[in-house]
Amino acid sequence: MGRKWANIVAKKTAKDGANSKVYAKFGVEIYVAAKKGDPDPESNSALKFVIDRAKQAQVPKHIIDKAIDKAKGNTDETFTEGRYEGFGPNGSMLIVDTLTSNVNRTAANVRAAFGKNGGNMGASGSVSYLFDNKGVIVFGGEDADAVFEQLLEADVDVDDVEAQEGTITVYTAPTDLHKAIVALRESGIEEFQVTELEMIPQSEVELSGEALETFEKLYSVLEDDEDVQKIYTNVDGF
């Protein structure tokens, strides 16, 4: 699958650490997970999963606690998940996942972001068929074979395990991501750099020059939208 997760994680963490918008987005995601189930992460696996991801992105504890406290209250604010697909310059493609309290606003904003920044919105499924839905786990380690065997023994549907420069990357079936995390924790792994459900491109494109500048602007505008939770792309390095 060829993605250099260690480098991508380092870039993302450096950016996320200084980005209050990321904190706000995680706040919404934590609120939704806590509202749907028990506000205690020890009895709500979906909430625990989101909190773990928030910690990986260096979201402060008070942001996490505030979102959980909000879910415990009497607020009836509701959020709806959405997915948009589209195209950028020179064969670049994007999948945009959203979580919003106003679907019409979000749809208009995403469409405008594509239209005003060198992209084109596509129909549902126009891009996603060229991506594979996988669970991705990244942590420090060297022995990919041993990790693969541990996961098989735990009856995890694991697709691949890669070792690169002191980092292990595990790819699982999306339905087995949680099972894999539990199995790895039971084997002694305490800290993860990434625990995500990802849409991984079947092939990547490299952009340079004006095409790269156009794509970066499109990506940045989408990322800055408060309703956009995740962006998947086939552009190398993103």
Curated annotation (Swiss-Prot):
Q: Which GO terms describe its biological process?
A: regulation of DNA-templated transcription
Family listed: Belongs to the TACO1 family. YeeN subfamily.
Transmembrane region(s):
none
Cellular component (GO) terms are: cytosol
Q: Which UniProt keywords apply?
A: Cytoplasm, DNA-binding, Transcription, Transcription regulation
Taken from the UniProt record, the cysteine pairs bridged by disulfide bonds within this chain are: none
Q: Does the keyword Transferase apply?
A: no
Where in or outside the cell it occurs: the entry states: Cytoplasm
- Check the record and name the InterPro entries matching this protein: Integrase-like_N, TACO1_YebC-like_2nd/3rd_dom, TACO1_YebC_N, Transcrip_reg_TACO1-like, Transcrip_reg_TACO1-like_dom3, Transcrip_reg_TACO1_YeeN, YebC-like
Q: Does the keyword Cell membrane apply?
A: no
Q: PANTHER family annotated for this entry? A: TRANSLATIONAL ACTIVATOR OF CYTOCHROME C OXIDASE 1
Q: Which GO terms describe its molecular function?
A: DNA binding
Q: What is this protein called?
A: Probable transcriptional regulatory protein SPH_2064
- Native source species: Streptococcus pneumoniae (strain Hungary19A-6)
Q: Write the lineage as a comma-separated list.
A: Bacteria, Bacillati, Bacillota, Bacilli, Lactobacillales
Coiled-coil portions:
none
